From Swiss-Prot:
Organism field: Staphylococcus carnosus (strain TM300)
Role, per record: Binds to DNA and alters its conformation. May be involved in regulation of gene expression, nucleoid organization and DNA protection.
GO cellular component, one term: bacterial nucleoid
Source species, domain of life: Bacteria
Protein's name according to its UniProt entry: Nucleoid-associated protein Sca_0120
Keyword hit for DNA-binding: yes
Gene3D superfamilies: Nucleoid-associated protein YbaB-like domain
UniProt feature, compositional bias: Basic and acidic residues: 20-34
InterPro entries per record: YbaB-like_sf, YbaB/EbfC
Sorted UniProt keywords: Cytoplasm, DNA-binding
Low complexity bias locations: 7-16
Amino acid sequence: MRGGGNMQQMMKQMQKMQKKMAEEQEKLKDEKVEGSAGGGMVKVVVTGHKEVVDVVIDEEAVDPDDVEMLQDLVLAATNEAMNKADELTSERLGKHTKGLNIPGM
């Protein structure tokens, strides 16, 4: 049974890594990132779990004759916030998977 100890050690390391990643995932739900558009006239805040928790629209961004512009600004700010949430997740979880070749991490 050569190598059995190595396999057990590897399994322990994997369990430890899974625990740390689960802890990081839990922390991410409380982390917030902000995306903005229109020079900050529209701001969207999301958690690390990509839950939108706040939308702030400056009065200057509201033009009843150009609703489409406001929609575009909200969309752009939301996409930016979601991308920042992805980056935060990759950064936080990536430190636990360094050196491993795991697709999508």
